[in-house]
Regions:
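Glycine-rich hexapeptide-repeat left-handed beta-helix
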Residues: 14-16, 22, 109, 116-220
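Generic, low-specificity signal for short hydrophobic/alpha-helical stretches with a mild N-terminal bias
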Residues: 9-13, 42, 60, 78, ...
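Terminal amphipathic alpha-helical/low-complexity segments used for targeting or macromolecular assembly
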Residues: 1-53, 58, 189, 195, ...
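Phosphate-binding glycine-rich loops and adjacent basic patches that engage nucleotide phosphates
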Residues: 1, 38-44, 56-59, 87-96, ...
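A generic structural signal for ordered alpha-helices
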Residues: 2-9, 52, 56, 74, ...
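A generic local structural motif
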Residues: 47-49, 66, 84, 161, ...
């Protein structure tokens, strides 16, 4: 699979960050500095700096029981629900939902993505209109703490990253209580059944019933 064809980078305020990358994961170490640079250049009539290095767009709803640590950008019409924990270095797109007891750190969430219930998203990128079911975990650290290697068919890609979660393609849905292993890449328009252990590279337009039972999705 072409792992660089699963995201529409026009569907995020961070588009510029992706332009010079060979692989999407290369943006992960750059998120913190990029947020500060971008935040200070935003239209102050539209984006408000509500705390140090935390910028919020128009019509954003932030529950008083949520926690937001900068640097962080939350784009227009997004809802941050009670108990959400944005742990720093996070870009949230337009019209997103970040829900109860969801923790996100060092990640980019594209427009219209939904992470609504009891999720962990670490060092990850979630594409346009992607959705995580309740309890989905995007794990970002191997048990042996070694650097993450992406295996794409016969190709091995050295990330030189100790922490990397998942890259989830546009319009992809991951079912409840699934666990996605570090360094996983999931193509666009793919559906993953609940309670699935996801690892490696999964193509676009697939239905993942289990890692041993992946079928093509009918395109309507």
């Amino acid at each position: 699979m072409d792992i660089n064809s699963i995201l529409d980078i026009d569907k995020t305020i961070s588009r510029e960050l992706f332009l010079d990358c060979t692989y999407y994961f290369e943006v992960l170490p750059k998120i913190k500095n990029y947020i500060v640079k971008l935040g200070n250049s935003l239209d102050k009539n539209k984006y408000k700096e509500i705390d140090t290095n935390i910028w919020v767009g128009e019509n954003v709803i932030i529950d008083k029981l949520s926690t937001i640590i900068g640097p962080c950008i939350i784009d227009d019409n997004t809802e941050i629900r009670p108990g959400a924990y944005l742990r720093g270095n996070v870009i949230i797109g337009k019209n997103c939902v970040i829900g109860n007891s969801t923790e996100i750190k060092n990640s980019i969430i594209f427009d219209y993505a939904q992470i609504p219930h009891y999720n962990y998203v670490g060092d990850s990128i979630l594409g346009y209109h992607s959705h995580l079911g309740a309890g989905v975990i995007l794990s970002n650290l191997k048990n042996d703490k070694s650097d993450i290697v992406i295996k794409n068919g016969n190709e091995k890609i050295e990330t030189n990253l100790r922490k990397m979660g998942a890259i989830v393609g546009d319009n992809t849905d991951i079912g409840c209580n699934s666990v996605v292993f570090p360094g996983s890449i999931i193509g666009k328009n793919t559906s993953i059944y609940p309670l699935t252990r996801v690892r490696g590279v999964i193509g676009s337009n697939k239905i993942v019933k289990s890692m041993d039972n992946i079928v093509n999705k009918e395109i309507k």
